[in-house]
């Protein structure tokens, strides 16, 4: 039954890609009974020298307070510990709806007090740019983890690192099968059972290198991360799930980063 349902959906997906994906997503959301968040992942490529801290200062002093006032909480801001060498700052903003993703920025910029407070960033001239470039990825939360999670370490004011992984898939139907593996297949539940601490799982609906998904895990440190993955890899339920041929050849490329939170990150 599982394969028959997926093959039918895949046929629709091949004939009408946008409508097929929408139908699958809506069907899953109805089953979950919970409203899924949308995540905005912003990557700032920073200049060298004294201007490198302008983006951090803007989020710390202006953007996060304004977002919280607008009802957007648990905003994460991170530095890269292991990943590309160029200086970057990563921001994760959870939204209650896709409409919020589209409209929030304009609402903030229509507020004169907000623009004045963030003028150094928002109106930075070409001769003194706050960032070199900015990239965005928009994701929809998985049904089995519909909202961003605040890690235990943050709640207890303890150090933490984040492992960020993107899974690229060779086709649209393969991407849907991998998401199915995390949700209905039980992979997220195995993560949680074995002590891995998910922060978010998101299907990329707008961004580069699609089709793909993103997930973020929190750990105390590298030792805890390695230990956690060892427990996961030896779990009987994971061994059974990973051997299921229904989920074979769903991931064509994996990208991996390690982030550390800024002092003002809410995640």
Predicted ranges, named:
Residues 3-25:
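N-terminal export signals
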Residues 7, 102-106, 166, 179, ...:
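Non-transmembrane alpha-helical segments in soluble domains
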Residues 22-34, 64-90, 96, 186-214:
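Short, glycine- and small/hydrophobic-rich beta-strand elements in well-ordered beta-sheets
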Residues 28-34, 127, 151-158:
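Short boundary motifs at domain starts and secondary-structure transition points
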Residues 35-37, 187, 191, 207-267:
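C-terminal functional regions that serve as terminal interaction/effector modules
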Residues 38-44, 66, 88-95, 136, ...:
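Short, structured motif recognition centered on aromatic/hydrophobic residues
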Residues 45-54, 61-69, 74-153, 169, ...:
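Hydrophobic, ordered structural segments
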Residues 141-222:
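Surface-exposed interaction/gating patches
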């Amino acid at each position: 039954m599982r394969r028959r349902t997926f093959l039918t959906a895949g046929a629709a997906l091949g004939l009408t890609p946008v409508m097929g994906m929408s139908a699958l997503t809506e069907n899953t959301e109805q089953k979950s009974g919970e409203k899924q968040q949308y995540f905005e992942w912003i990557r700032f490529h920073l200049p060298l020298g004294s201007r490198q801290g302008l983006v951090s200062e803007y989020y710390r002093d202006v953007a996060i307070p304004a977002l919280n006032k607008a009802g957007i909480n648990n905003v994460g801001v991170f530095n890269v510990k292991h990943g590309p060498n160029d200086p970057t700052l990563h921001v994760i903003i959870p939204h209650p709806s896709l409409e919020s993703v589209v409209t929030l920025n304009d609402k903030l910029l229509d507020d004169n007090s907000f623009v004045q407070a963030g003028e150094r960033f928002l109106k930075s001239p070409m001769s003194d740019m706050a960032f070199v470039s900015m990239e965005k990825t928009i994701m929809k939360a998985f049904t089995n983890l519909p909202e961003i999670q605040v890690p235990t370490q943050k709640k207890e004011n303890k150090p933490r690192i984040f492992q960020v992984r993107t899974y690229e898939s060779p086709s649209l139907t393969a991407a849907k099968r991998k998401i199915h593996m995390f949700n209905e297949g039980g992979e997220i539940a195995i993560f949680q059972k074995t002590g891995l601490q998910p922060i978010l799982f998101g299907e990329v609906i707008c961004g580069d290198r699609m089709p793909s998904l993103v997930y973020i895990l929190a750990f105390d440190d590298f030792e805890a991360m390695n230990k956690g993955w060892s427990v996961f890899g030896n779990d009987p339920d994971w061994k059974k799930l990973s051997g299921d041929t229904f989920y074979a050849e769903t991931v064509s490329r994996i990208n991996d980063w390690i982030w550390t939170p800024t002092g003002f990150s809410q995640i």
